Amino acid sequence: MASKPIGRAGDVQFAADGLFEFLRIAGQADAEFNKKMRIAAEQVAQHVVDRAKVNAQGQPKHGQNRPGSSGMSQAQAVVNGLRARRDRIPTIKLDHKRGFVSASLPNRKRKTKVTMGDVFFGAEFGGRRRPTTQQFLRHRGRQGYFFWQAVRDSNSFIAKEYSDAIDRVLKELAQGAT
């Protein structure tokens, strides 16, 4: 089963060929299948979120420490907004409306509030090409610094663990039916 990530950077799902058709048929056959698959897929997605958090810990701080600075890199602050969602396929969502906490210039002093979604793409893919993106690390194209790196590194784990989870759920349901 070859899996591939689909979606945008802040909202990604992992799917394989024919997976959606299989999930539809299996979900219609037994309602308990959907419940158990949601729990199993959330555990697989949580592994990727944990890897992204580890990758974000390794990111350098952006610029000099200033008075009132939290001492965290933007990646460390943004990765706290990533959540593994309970869906039938492993899904990760960014809480993009959540406020981005800045100790040096807090949101209460700003007219337009800064959100996690505003900072995520710069922290993940970089910037420095325009005057408005100088606070980010250098641009790395589609490579990514912490989140997509975790997705790529976990690709084989996701495929294996998710297919094992499908097998476990089907075996549990088969034992319960007899």
Feature map (PLM): residue ranges:
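Short, low-complexity, charged/polar segments at coil/turn and helix-coil boundaries
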Residues: 2-5, 24-137, 173-178
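Short helix/strand-capping connector loops at secondary-structure junctions
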Residues: 135-154
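C-terminal or internal capping secondary-structure element at the end of a domain, subdomain, or sheet
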Residues: 150-178
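Small-xxx-small helix-packing motif
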Residues: 11-19
